[in-house]
């Protein structure tokens, strides 16, 4: 089966690295702890979406830098590029799940969303193949609910 050029959060995992639970730390990145910090930021910036987005972006960028340092150290120690690329993709999976959770929990919250009120995230490129180079970026398309 040929990998799709895009991936969604609801798509089945591409490989073993993507099957990791969101609770399993990847490259030192602890998703549950980061999500707790984001929830605290949302509470602190309640009613100020721009300030919340900025604070969340700063937090996630700092966590990404730390995780990339861990990835580099693991790559140099293990000398296994594909494994590192898979781990980086799993890291990005965790970050995208956090972004989705933060957006649906704090920015576009709906207690009982209908089909037309659900947000979708679409990614393209190497991310869809489950492999990320160390300095790769991800092109994401957030498809927002028609009611905002």
Model-found features: residue ranges?
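N-terminal regions immediately upstream of nucleotidyltransferase
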Residues: 2-117, 135
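Catalytic metal-binding acidic patch
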Residues: 120-148
């Amino acid at each position: 089966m040929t990998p799709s050029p895009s991936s969604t959060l609801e798509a089945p995992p591409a490989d073993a690295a993507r099957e990791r639970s969101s609770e399993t730390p990847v490259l030192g990145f602890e998703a549950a702890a980061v999500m707790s910090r984001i929830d605290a930021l949302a509470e602190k910036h309640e009613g100020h979406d721009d300030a919340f987005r900025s604070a969340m972006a700063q937090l996630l960028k700092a966590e990404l830098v730390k995780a990339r340092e861990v990835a580099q150290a693991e790559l140099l120690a293990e000398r296994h590029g594909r494994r590192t690329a898979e781990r980086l993709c799993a890291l990005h999976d965790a970050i995208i799940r956090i972004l989705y959770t933060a957006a649906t929990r704090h920015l576009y919250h709906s207690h009982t969303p209908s089909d037309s009120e659900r947000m979708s995230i679409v990614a393209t490129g190497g991310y869809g193949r489950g492999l990320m180079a160390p300095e790769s970026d991800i092109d994401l398309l957030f498809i927002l609910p028609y009611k905002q």
